[in-house]
Amino acid sequence: MTPLRQLISLLHLASPALPIGGFSYSQGLEAAIDIGCVRDADTAERWIRDSLLYVQAQCEAPLWLLLHRGWQAMDVDAVREWNGWFHATRETAELRLETEQMGWSLAKLVGQMGWGGDALREHLAVISPVCLPTAFAATCVALEIDEREGLAAYCFNWAENQVAAAIKAVPLGQVAGQHMLRRLHEAVLMTVDEAVQRAAETPPRLSTFSPMLGLLSSRHETQYSRLFRS
């Protein structure tokens, strides 16, 4: 695939218009706003940046690389193992529902669009529950997107959804949100670099230590007033 074609595929996959429901989740951000941990643009940006560097970069991003490599080699056993591992690390009902729903929606879209070979689509369709990183990595392989570029799109899409949630729930202005997203570019790149290093180790150095995220997600389940599903 030419670089330009790969770029267009990346833009398609990272688009907010992709019908997988990312706009309906905040991954604990709304609960952080409710208790006052996040209260303005500065604290929202710090929250999202720290989540990238200390949560995504240490677990989900390196695991995404392992899933991409599994799909690339059509090592279905490895894909299933890492998919199950990631699902087991979702500490609350809301976080499990989020990755299951978005993963299922993207896997269904891959089949409907006819992306990738028959074997990839068939194996993806029968993984249940299929987590979002598993489905996104499979889609990148199907669209011939390299692992670093695919992971950058995955992380940027995550950051963009977080900024959109902050705009609605803090609330913030649209321009403030764009300034925030622009300043997060470097954090996305740092997340990719850290993930590459962690995925290269034997065994891969994955850490799920994020107790505040689990507590906030649990709190969000009974939050009185909320806009988001997580």
Swiss-Prot record:
Molecular function via GO: nickel cation binding
Assigned keywords, A-Z: Chaperone, Cytoplasm, Nickel insertion
InterPro entries (UniProt xref): UreF (IPR002639), UreF_sf (IPR038277)
Locations listed in the record: Cytoplasm
Top-rank taxon: Bacteria
Pfam families for this protein: UreF
Keyword Cytoplasm tagged: yes
Main location: cytoplasm
Keyword hit for Chaperone: yes
GO (cellular component) term, any one: cytoplasm
Function: Required for maturation of urease via the functional incorporation of the urease nickel metallocenter.
Family under the similarity heading: Belongs to the UreF family.
Assembly behavior: UreD, UreF and UreG form a complex that acts as a GTP-hydrolysis-dependent molecular chaperone, activating the urease apoprotein by helping to assemble the nickel containing metallocenter of UreC. The UreE protein probably delivers the nickel.
Name recorded for this polypeptide: Urease accessory protein UreF
